[in-house]
């Protein structure tokens, strides 16, 4: 089972894809102008990822579930998740199960203008204890926020703030999610971007990509390379009942 995380910078023209169907452009015209460019960029990124991985020349039809989660109408196609952070667009895709992606810019987590800023989030006593022991508490808060939202986006219930439905135990590297039996999440804090990918039932392999419309795809360090980096801030969380060790082989 493979999982892919692709991202690109929302610069004019750089994420425009020729693989978008006319229906997608029509849908974009029906949303507010300030959201049109990022809508087309995210669909373009997904379309290019589907072409790279499967040779599918045009983005398949997407429908929206009742709680707002977009999915391919063809249930035989992979699960995907879309996220935005500043001028960056991200897409996660998994070949089996479901996935969720969330991203935050490092500087946004330190400012009042971010809708998911740490000051707007209530942490549990367990989470607060872990945060207090980290070298960069702001970054630690951002990691927990993105990790939580990636799991909620996986379940399709992103607005659910009930702690009984999702508990994070960062000291143990575990989580408890009431809606799925098996889930794993990976969260990394880079110099600019904090991101988290959650997958059911497990993350066996995660490839990281970057797309520039002018220069094409670029492969970024995968999770094993990141885990072996002495300065790595990567965290891996597994469902409480199915915890397994992370072996960078």
From Swiss-Prot:
Which GO biological process annotations does it have? Answer: lysine biosynthetic process via aminoadipic acid
Domain of life of the organism in this record? Bacteria
The GO cellular component terms are: cytosol
Q: Tell me, what is one Gene Ontology molecular-function annotation carried by this entry? A: holo-[acyl-carrier-protein] synthase activity
Q: Which InterPro entries match?
A: 4-PPantetheinyl_Trfase_dom_sf, P-Pant_transferase_sf
PANTHER family the record matches: CYTOPLASMIC PROTEIN (PTHR12215:SF22), PHOSPHOPANTETHEINE TRANSFERASE (PTHR12215)
**Descriptive protein name:** Uncharacterized protein YieE
Which organism is this protein's natural source? Escherichia coli (strain K12)
Q: Which gene encodes it?
A: yieE
């Amino acid at each position: 089972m493979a999982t892919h995380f692709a991202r690109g910078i929302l610069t004019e023209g750089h994420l425009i894809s020729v693989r978008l169907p006319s229906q997608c452009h029509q849908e974009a015209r029906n949303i507010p102008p300030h959201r049109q460019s990022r809508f087309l960029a995210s669909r373009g990124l997904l379309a290019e990822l589907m072409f790279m991985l499967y040779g599918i020349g045009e983005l398949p039809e997407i429908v929206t579930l009742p709680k707002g989660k977009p999915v391919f109408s063809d249930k035989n196609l992979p699960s995907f998740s879309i996220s935005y952070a500043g001028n960056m667009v991200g897409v996660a895709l998994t070949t089996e199960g479901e996935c969720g992606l969330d991203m935050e810019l490092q500087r946004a987590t330190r400012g009042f203008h971010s809708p998911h800023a740490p000051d707007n989030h209530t942490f549990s006593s367990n989470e607060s204890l872990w945060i207090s022991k980290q070298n960069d508490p702001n970054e630690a808060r951002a990691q927990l926020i993105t990790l939580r939202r990636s799991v909620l986006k996986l379940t399709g219930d992103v607005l659910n703030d009930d702690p009984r439905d999702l508990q994070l135990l960062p000291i143990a590297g575990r989580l408890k999610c009431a809606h799925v039996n098996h889930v794993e999440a990976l969260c990394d804090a880079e110099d600019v971007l904090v991101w988290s990918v959650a997958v059911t039932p497990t993350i066996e392999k995660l490839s990281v990509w970057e797309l520039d419309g002018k220069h094409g795809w670029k492969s970024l360090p995968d999770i094993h390379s990141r885990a072996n980096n002495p300065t790595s801030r990567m965290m891996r969380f597994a469902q409480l009942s199915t915890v397994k060790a992370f072996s960078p082989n």
